[in-house]
From Swiss-Prot:
The gene is macB. One of its GO terms (biological process) is response to antibiotic. Homodimer. Its main location: membrane. It comes from Campylobacter jejuni (strain RM1221). This is Macrolide export ATP-binding/permease protein MacB. ATP binds at residues 34-41.
Length: 641
């Protein structure tokens, strides 16, 4: 079963083992005796594949161990070797049954099978009443019996016992030795390391070692031929194994987080703030953007204004005029939903003893809908008003507020106001326009543009034509077509256009830029949170080095250890992300309750992005600590206090 030839182990210039050669057959009970520093524990660690010899040959059950990689050695420990340590090496967060079951988890056995086997072993060792007890609730002898049960859960063809009675009282020590003798009688190969000749005398074969060399190897009697346990089948990556790995990792991660609540919360704080920032920034951006786009829609979405001149502020624009012929040409275009004229003039509005500087806006029937003007009381202009040049007016909010400060809108309908000595009957009052990007205090009276031209200015030319493009038509294409048609008709391009979509696109682009910049700040917060997670995970690896060594000793693969710490990092980040989302929901609710300007809009994609990014942060910043844990040397890890 075990064959060692010329095994040497050097640490620096010190020779721990010197050309050790021996063989151990299946079913033997061998005691390796020696004083402290003799090399007996180093030899046991090499036999148990926890340590690697500096030179020599080691064959275990027809496998040349010196040529196996770390995971292949872990498989040997998992399937064929069971360890009994002097200090028990039980995991403090697990119950007796869970400690015993742990090697079976890494072996891929299902929950029912490993639970039944663990209960049977503990029952056989008179611990049926301690299944759910934690190690600190057990006596030394009971802990050692749990350790023996753990060594047997996967079969334990070879049992390696390192000073198993060293920390026990005499009664418990005798019980442990009796258990080992009984296991040997059942066919288990036992290798016992001790410094006590009386304990060594219980074995059938004693090997004495001193200063790294074998002094004697005596067989007291021939080993009994007993039933040899079957070799476990070749390992396969089954679904059960993957489920076991994931479940065990989640359970340990959860226990670790609960065991250090304050530290875990402080670690999550960076993630919580980062995720809440991401969700709130997106919600703020969507809310403000929706408000602006709604305002633009009310101001006139898909609208194009045609004005004389080369552009805003053109001094020669006064010499250029648009006319009714241009208006009719545009009305004939089928891709335009509405076309109307717009002119204005300044003057004085008077009601009783109140006189104000005001502006008369000459508009058509469609202007109110095109510009998004909403009626508060009364009605808007109709076709008869425009056709007959009627002296009627619709007051805006500023006109109503200044001319009729203490009256309701519906109470002033039918009254007459003067504008530049012309009397106008009030037929409607507009709502306050809260959608304008910049609030102004201009007093406006909306009258038929025909009334303005015929009775106020005498000018038959138009200051502006405003059109609304159909929803299924590109406003840019429509604008280009209008420019070409009017340019051909007028013989020159002595006018300019303003497309509301240009303003809309500029606002959207500005909001997008602002959102990106703010999101960058949130991402930085996430990265800072991720660095905090990595720092805590490095501390966790350092604190749990001994636990890692124990898991490796009972057969955990490197990927098992790595997955354990990666899942813990991801779990911390995910819990932090969930708390961050919950916090952001409260913030959004509070903001929407208190703010009347615009709402914050919670976006499902931003929540999903936050959760996914937190997992990504967990993987990225948890990888380095997890890799460090997986690369630990089992012997160094086990010796860590």
């Amino acid at each position: 079963m075990i064959f060692l030839k010329n095994i040497c182990k050097n640490i620096g210039e010190n020779a721990i083992l010197k050309n050790v050669s021996l063989s151990i057959e299946k079913g033997e009970f061998v005691a390796i005796i020696g004083q402290s520093g003799s090399g007996k524990t180093s030899l046991l660690n090499i036999i148990g594949t926890l340590d690697t010899p500096s030179s020599g040959t080691y064959v275990f059950d027809e496998y040349e161990v010196t040529k196996l990689n770390n995971d292949e050695k872990a498989r040997l420990r998992r399937e064929k070797i069971g360890f009994i340590f002097q200090r028990y090496n039980l995991l403090s967060l697990l119950s007796a049954k869970e400690n015993v079951s742990l090697p079976a988890v890494y072996a891929g056995k299902n929950l029912q099978e490993r639970s039944q086997n663990a209960k049977k072993l503990l029952n056989d060792l008179e611990l049926a009443h301690k299944l759910d007890s934690k190690p600190n609730e057990l006596s030394g002898g009971q802990q050692q019996r749990v350790s023996i049960a753990r060594a047997l859960i996967n079969g334990g063809e070879l049992i390696l016992a390192d000073e198993p009675t060293g920390a026990l009282d005499s009664k418990s020590g005798i019980m442990v030795l009796e258990i080992l003798q009984k296991l040997n009688e059942q066919g288990h190969t036992i290798v016992l390391v001790t410094h006590d000749p009386k304990i060594a005398a219980q074995a059938k074969r004693v090997i004495e070692i001193k200063d790294g060399e074998i002094l004697s190897d005596t067989k007291k009697e021939k080993a009994q031929e007993k039933l040899i346990l079957k070799t476990m089948p070749k390992e396969k990556k089954t679904l059960t194994l993957l489920k076991n790995q994931a479940f065990e990792c989640f359970k340990i991660a959860y226990s670790s987080i609960l065991a250090h609540k304050l530290r875990s919360i402080l670690t999550m704080l960076g993630i919580i703030i980062g995720i809440a920032s991401v969700v709130c920034v997106v919600a703020l951006g969507l809310g403000s953007q929706a408000k602006v786009l709604e305002s633009i829609a009310r101001l006139g979405t898909n609208t194009i204004e045609i004005r004389p001149g080369k552009g805003f502020g053109d001094l020669r624009s006064g010499k250029t005029r648009l006319n009714f012929s241009d208006l009719e040409t545009l009305r004939s275009l089928e891709y335009l939903e509405a076309v109307d004229a717009h002119s204005n003039t300044s003057g004085v509005a008077t009601y009783t003893n109140i006189s104000l500087s005001a502006r008369a806006e000459g508009v058509g029937v469609n202007n109110f809908a095109i510009e998004g003007l909403r009626i508060d009381a009364g009605r808007i202009l109709n076709n008869d008003d425009v056709k007959n040049s009627t002296n009627v007016a619709v007051l805006d909010f500023n006109a109503k507020k200044n001319l009729f400060p203490d009256e309701k809108s519906e109470n002033i309908l039918g009254r007459v106001v003067l504008f530049n000595s012309q009397s106008f009957k009030i037929i409607g009052v507009l709502q306050k326009d809260t959608d304008k990007p910049i609030e102004d205090n201009v007093v406006r009276l909306y009258i038929p543009y025909t009334t303005l031209m015929n009775k106020l200015t005498g000018d038959r030319n138009l200051r502006e034509i405003i059109v609304k493009v159909k929803d299924d038509v590109s406003s840019t294409l429509a604008e280009n077509a209008i420019i070409r048609i009017l340019e051909i008709k007028r013989g020159q391009k002595d006018f300019f256009t303003f497309n509301s979509d240009t303003f809309k696109q500029a606002i959207t682009a500005n909001k997008r830029t602002t959102t990106i910049l703010t999101a960058c700040v949130a991402v930085i917060a996430l990265i800072v949170g991720g660095i905090g997670v990595m720092n805590i995970m490095l501390v966790s690896v350092s604190e749990r080095t001994r636990e890692i060594g124990i898991r490796m000793a009972i057969g955990a693969r490197r990927e098992d250890i790595m997955m354990q710490f990666l899942i813990e990092a991801v779990m911390i980040c995910t819990i932090g992300a969930i708390l961050g989302v919950i916090l952001s929901i409260f913030v959004i609710f509070a903001f929407n309750t208190l703010s009347t300007d615009f709402p914050m809009i919670l976006n499902a994609y931003s929540v999903l992005l936050g959760l996914l990014s937190s997992m990504f942060i967990g993987v990225v910043f948890g990888f380095f600590p997890a890799r460090n844990a997986a690369n630990l040397n089992p012997i160094s890890a086990l010796s860590k206090e």
